[in-house]
A protein has these predicted regions:
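A short glycine-rich, Lys/Arg-flanked "PGG" loop and its adjoining helix->strand segment in the class I
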Residues: 130-142
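A short SAM/SAH-binding and catalytic strip from SAM-dependent methyltransferases
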Residues: 117-130
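Short alpha-helix
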Residues: 183-199
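Conserved class I S-adenosyl-L-methionine
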Residues: 1-48, 61-65, 147-172
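C-terminal helical/coil "lid" or tail adjacent to the Rossmann-like core of SAM-dependent
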Residues: 6, 13, 17, 21, ...
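A short acidic, Gly/Pro-enriched loop at the edge of an enzyme's catalytic core
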Residues: 109-118
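Class I SAM-dependent methyltransferase SAM/SAH-binding core
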Residues: 53-55, 59-107
Length: 274
């Protein structure tokens, strides 16, 4: 799964559907991350603007939440791999200073700035947490905060079990849903905590969020997994979004409805001296 492939999927498939947020997983998760920041009082009684760098900002859904709480006291910066996603963010946030690049290069942009808050949301499946952590640390002010939000490999257990039965693998050319070998997400909460600690962060708040998912049929699944961006590389690899009427009937008859859950780690960590 190359950077160019991911970028193309976000530009051509995901960007125009992202804000629809089927199943409300993105919005509900961002609400929890926003609440962590609010209760830590990062937005209260500041003498100057809070410099926020949202890495993997998408269409600006998180920055708009912060600005709804703090208004003009936010100075927003953002990075995203998709030009189309950033265009959507500019429409919502006129003061946004943005750049197009992979999150692996987050430390290469806005070199004149250090930040009070850096947010990395749903990108550790593409850029490993151990790569992100030192780069985030280097761009934060002393005592600054990192809002980390990312899936773990424990997500979608029922989907993984169903998708990897022998009949479905045969139908799709022997290919399986290989989460372990495809995404770079941390294994679990402990891996997140250990990585943050090793890189000079103290976790101030953390939550494991497991929102329930229910897909009545293939169309509902594709709205979430393919067009919504959650499993686009997997769906694209096996051509699930292109199946004909017979395969669609079979899947709706024997695979759906499907109930499952996501698994997301939501952490607010503070930079400390090494």
């Amino acid at each position: 799964m190359t950077t160019d492939t991911i970028q193309q999927q976000y530009n051509d498939v995901i960007a125009c559907h992202y804000d629809l947020d089927p199943q409300s997983v993105t919005g509900d998760t961002l609400d929890r991350a926003t609440e962590q920041i609010r209760t830590q009082q990062l937005l209260v009684d500041r003498p100057d603007k809070l410099r926020v760098y949202d890495v993997g900002m998408g269409t600006g859904m998180f920055l708009t939440r912060l600005m709804a709480l703090a208004g003009n006291s936010i100075q927003p910066f953002g990075l995203d791999l998709s030009e189309k996603m950033i265009e959507c963010a500019y429409q919502k946030i006129p003061d946004l200073v943005g750049a197009v690049d992979t999150a692996a290069n987050l430390d290469a942009h806005f070199p004149e700035q250090s930040f009070d808050l850096i947010c990395t949301h749903f990108i550790s499946g593409f850029v490993p947490l151990h790569v992100l952590a030192p780069k985030v640390w280097s761009r934060l002010e002393e005592g600054g905060y990192w809002s980390y939000l990312g899936a773990t490999k424990g997500a979608y257990p029922n989907l993984q079990a169903k998708a990897n039965n022998k009949l479905l693998q045969w139908m799709f050319g022997g290919r399986k849903l290989d989460v372990e070998g495809t995404v770079l997400s941390p294994k679990d909460r402990q891996e997140v905590l250990d990585t943050l600690d090793r890189n000079g962060f103290v976790v101030r708040q953390c939550e494991t969020f497991e929102p329930k998912l229910r897909f009545a049929n293939l169309d509902e699944f594709l709205d979430f997994a393919y067009y919504g961006g959650w499993l686009t590389p997997f769906v694209d690899a096996i051509g699930l979004h292109k199946v004909g009427p017979v395969t669609r009937w079979f899947l709706n008859r024997f695979f759906f409805p499907l109930e499952d859950h996501h698994c997301v780690e939501i952490h607010l960590a503070q930079k400390m001296s090494r």
